């Protein structure tokens, strides 16, 4: 049996850890809320339309890659107005579908680097979840 005093200490410690975890996860989500990143396959032009927008206007440089194709698309460029749109022509649709063709983006954001990864989707589909990472 746990003594009442020890039970109280354990209860307070458990609640404190829970609060810290919840606050930290909300901070991370809020940190990335200002970014929009999408990759859409345009059937008519057989190309991929990639869009990025940073509503905080702190993005200055990008490294964009489309992996999983016969030849990896790689481009590095300066971003103006913290947004860009790229139309990337492709030779053919991947044999095993778009899930095997991730689009990655590395953004210089203020004093840090933000990494993003998404999947290409058809025009009539909902945008997949964007995975974020950060390096200070």
Residue ranges of model-derived segments:
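Short, surface-exposed binding/anchoring microloops in extracellular/periplasmic proteins
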Residues: 20-69
């Amino acid at each position: 049996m746990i003594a009442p005093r020890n039970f109280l200490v354990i209860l307070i410690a458990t609640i404190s850890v829970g609060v810290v975890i919840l606050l930290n996860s909300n901070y991370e989500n809020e940190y990335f809320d200002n970014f929009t990143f999408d990759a859409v396959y345009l059937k008519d032009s057989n190309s991929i339309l990639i869009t990025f927008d940073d509503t905080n206007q702190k993005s200055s440089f990008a490294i964009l890659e489309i992996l999983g194709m016969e030849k990896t698309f790689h481009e590095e460029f300066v971003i103006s107005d913290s947004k860009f749109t790229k139309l990337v022509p492709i030779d053919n649709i991947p044999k095993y579908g778009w899930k095997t063709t991730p689009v990655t983006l590395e953004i210089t954001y203020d004093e840090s680097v933000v990494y993003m990864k998404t999947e290409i989707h058809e025009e009539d589909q909902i945008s997949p979840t964007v995975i974020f990472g950060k390096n200070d």
